[in-house]
Regions:
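Active-site neighborhood of thiol-dependent amide/isopeptide-bond enzymes
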Residues: 46-104, 108
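Loop/turn elements at helix/coil->beta-strand transitions in domains of secreted/extracellular proteins
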Residues: 32-37, 84-90, 110-113
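His-Asp-centered catalytic microenvironments across diverse enzyme cores
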Residues: 101-103, 107-216
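Aromatic-acidic/polar surface patches that form glycan- and anion
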Residues: 32, 68, 72, 164
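Small-side-chain structural scaffolding
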Residues: 26, 36, 76, 80-81, ...
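Secondary-structure boundary elements
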Residues: 1-67, 214
C-alpha cells in the first residue's frame, strides 16, 4: 500500500512535467495563468465526460486518467490535484444554487483566489488577470472558454445551452453568498474541500497527525 501511494505520487509529478512538455501553446501571456489554463486544456483534450448510464468506479484519481472519462466532480478532483502538484494552492467543492450542486475548482494566484470550471472549460477574468472570488461575487468579471465558441456567444453549462449574459448572471448568483478570500484563507487547507493535498506523502502524514490530535 505504501509502495502504491508513492507510485501514484511520482505519477502525478511526471504527469505535470509531461503536460508542459506536450503543451507548447500560449493561452495567456502571464506564465502563472498560462500554466493554470494549460492543465485544464490538457484535461479537456484527454478526459471525456461520462455518458448517461455508464458505470462509475473511482478508487483514486489515477483511475480517472486510465479510464479517460470523468464526471464533473472528478474533473475538478483531478484538476485541483494537478494544480497542487504544480505548486498552487487549490481545492474543489460543490456550490449549491436553486437546489442544484455545481462543482468548481478554486486556485490561489498572487495572493488571491480565483475560480475555474474545468469540466465546462470556463474561467473568469477581470482586465488581463483571472478574476478574484470577490470580483465574481461583485459581478465584476467576464467569462472566457477553453472551448471554441460560435459568434453568438452561446455556451454549454452542464449540458444546458445558455448565452453569455445568462451564464454570467448565473455564475454571479451561484457565488454571491460564497466565502470571501479572508474566510477561505482562515480555513485549514485540509478542510477547504476535496483531496488535492492528500496525494502527496508528506501532506498525507501531516494530515493524519493533525487528525490524531484533533487539530483539524
Amino acid at each position: 500500500k505504501i509502495y502504491d501511494f508513492f507510485k501514484r505520487h511520482y505519477f502525478y509529478k511526471k504527469l505535470i512535467d509531461d503536460i508542459f512538455l506536450e503543451k507548447k501553446i500560449s493561452l495567456h501571456q502571464q506564465n502563472k495563468i498560462n500554466n493554470i489554463l494549460l492543465i485544464n486544456n490538457w484535461l479537456l483534450e484527454n478526459i471525456n465526460p461520462i455518458t448517461q448510464g455508464e458505470t462509475i468506479i473511482d478508487f483514486h484519481p489515477i483511475t480517472i486518467i486510465n479510464r479517460a472519462k470523468a464526471t464533473s466532480d472528478q474533473f475538478n478532483d483531478l484538476y485541483s490535484i494537478l494544480l497542487v502538484y504544480n505548486k498552487y494552492e487549490s481545492f474543489y467543492k460543490f456550490i449549491s444554487y436553486n437546489n442544484i450542486s455545481y462543482p468548481f475548482t478554486f486556485v490561489k494566484i498572487d495572493n488571491y483566489w480565483t475560480i475555474i470550471d474545468p469540466y465546462n472549460g470556463f474561467y473568469f477574468v477581470k482586465d488581463n488577470n483571472l478574476a478574484s472570488v470577490n470580483d465574481i461575487k461583485n459581478n465584476n468579471f467576464k467569462i472566457l472558454s477553453l472551448h471554441k465558441t460560435n459568434d453568438n456567444k452561446n455556451y454549454i453549462f452542464f449540458d444546458t445551452l445558455v448565452n453569455e449574459d445568462i451564464l454570467k448572471n448565473k455564475i454571479n448568483k451561484i457565488f454571491i453568498n460564497f466565502d470571501t478570500k479572508d474566510v477561505i484563507d482562515s480555513k485549514h487547507k485540509y478542510k477547504r474541500g476535496g483531496r488535492s493535498y492528500l496525494q502527496d506523502p508528506i501532506n498525507r502524514i501531516k494530515y493524519e497527525i493533525l487528525k490524531i490530535f484533533n487539530i483539524i
